From Swiss-Prot:
The keyword Hydrolase applies. It comes from Shewanella baltica (strain OS155 / ATCC BAA-1091). GO terms for biological process: putrescine biosynthetic process. HAMAP family: Agmatine_deimin (MF_01841). Belongs to the agmatine deiminase family. GO terms for molecular function: agmatine deiminase activity; protein-arginine deiminase activity. Its EC number is 3.5.3.12. It comes from the Bacteria. Gene3D superfamilies: L-arginine/glycine Amidinotransferase, Chain A (3.75.10.10). It catalyses: agmatine + H2O = N-carbamoylputrescine + NH4(+). The active site is at C361 (amidino-cysteine intermediate). InterPro entries: Agmatine_deiminase, Peptidyl-Arg-deiminase_porph. This is Putative agmatine deiminase.
Length: 370
């Protein structure tokens, strides 16, 4: 499939005015988007290892949901060799491959219609701690995805990555202050103004603010690496029992918030604790495979922000990252207990983690709307 013409004319209304809202991830999905990894200054061996891992993730998702892969023209032939045949390749320019953060948030209404929210994007901080420059192609990704599906587009006046929000589909939005209130995202806006915009564009009513995300998360603490909804009234929190670990105070503070809050429906939350893998660190061999560029350096000995919470719910499957042989089986068992009606599929995902994220970060679901 070739690059679709981008519709430059956004709607002048807001989703909440039009009766549209962001559904929960467990709502039925018509597709999942991914983007081809190729940056040599972020992915070792010019992305070769990551590409093989992305193919395994796409294969795991494809058993439940159609997969679209955005690929720059120069890499289409290579992607055809690597990707499973069921993956639909779409010619698309991008600066990197984080579909969760550069793709649209698709909102739905009660009639089953879909539209998309196109957020502002500045590569996780712009010139104040951002992860690479330029990001001009990434700014066009959401429009291209929406055009591919023929969805109308809302243009939101807010710098926001999809990985920084989770919703329960019933009026609750969960996020982190470390990211959304960071001075390198929307310094001109107050917390209240940000909440108002999220009400407008997600059609949510209540917010659960955790202070911090996962230790050493270079996105400034995205919620999707730290905590997510399992179903209405239930959340899953990244956890360690080791009080000497720098992650412990972050997870403990989050637990305190979650234990003392209610969702938009007035429910107290049931909290599941998902164990932390590792700790995990970048090796010398892994760091040497990354070339110098505008991306953040990958340094040997640097702690990686590994988390099993960074999984994707897609129709009848949970696709989660396998990160540590010592804890992978424990994580899989815990996820099966939380999601007894789902098929739990693990994919070895260290190569994604080395680039700064994981399975949830590299995917963006398109709800069915039905």
């Amino acid at each position: 499939m070739t690059n679709a013409n981008v519709d430059a004319t956004p709607l002048t209304t807001k989703p909440s005015q039009d009766g549209f809202y962001m559904p929960a991830e467990w709502a039925a999905q018509q597709a999942v988007w991914m983007i081809w990894p190729y940056r040599p200054d972020n992915w070792r061996s010019a992305g070769a290892y990551a590409q093989a891992t992305f193919a395994k993730v796409a294969d795991a998702i494809g058993g439940a949901t159609p997969v679209y892969m955005g690929v720059p023209k120069a890499f289409l032939a290579e992607a055809q060799k690597v990707m499973p045949s069921h993956v639909t390749l779409v010619e698309m320019d991008s600066n990197d491959c984080w579909a969760r953060d550069t793709g649209p948030t698709v909102v739905v209404n009660d009639n089953g219609e879909c539209r998309g929210v196109d957020w502002g994007f500045n590569a996780w901080g712009g010139h104040n701690g951002g992860l690479y420059f330029p990001w001009d192609k990434d700014e066009q990704v959401a429009q291209q995805m929406l055009k591919q599906h023929g969805f109308a587009r809302y243009s939101a006046p807010l710098i926001l990555e999809g990985g920084s929000i989770h919703v329960d589909g019933e009026g609750t939005c969960m996020t982190s202050a470390e990211c959304l209130l960071n001075a390198n995202r929307n310094p001109e806006l107050t917390k209240e103004q940000i909440e108002d915009l999220l009400r407008d564009y997600l059609n949510v009513k209540q917010f659960i603010w955790l202070q911090d995300g996962v230790y050493m998360d270079e996105t400034d603490g995205h919620i999707d690496n730290m905590c997510c909804f399992a179903r209405p009234g239930e959340v899953i929190l990244h956890w360690t029992d080791d009080e000497t670990d720098p992650q412990y105070p972050r997870s403990k503070a989050a637990l305190d918030v979650l234990q003392n809050t209610v969702d938009a429906q007035g429910r107290k939350l049931k909290i599941h604790l998902l164990p932390q893998p590792g700790p995990l660190y970048c090796t010398e061999e892994e760091s040497l495979g990354v070339t110098e560029g505008t991306g953040v350096p990958r340094t040997a000995g640097e702690r990686l922000a590994g988390s099993y919470v960074n999984f994707l719910i897609t129709n009848n499957r949970i696709v989660f990252p396998m990160l540590d042989p010592a804890t992978d089986d424990i994580a899989a068992q815990k996820l099966q207990e939380i999601f007894p009606e789902y098929e739990i599929i693990g994919v070895p995902a260290r190569e994604i983690l080395l680039g700064g994220g994981n399975i949830h970060c590299i995917t963006q679901q398109i709800p069915s709307g039905k």
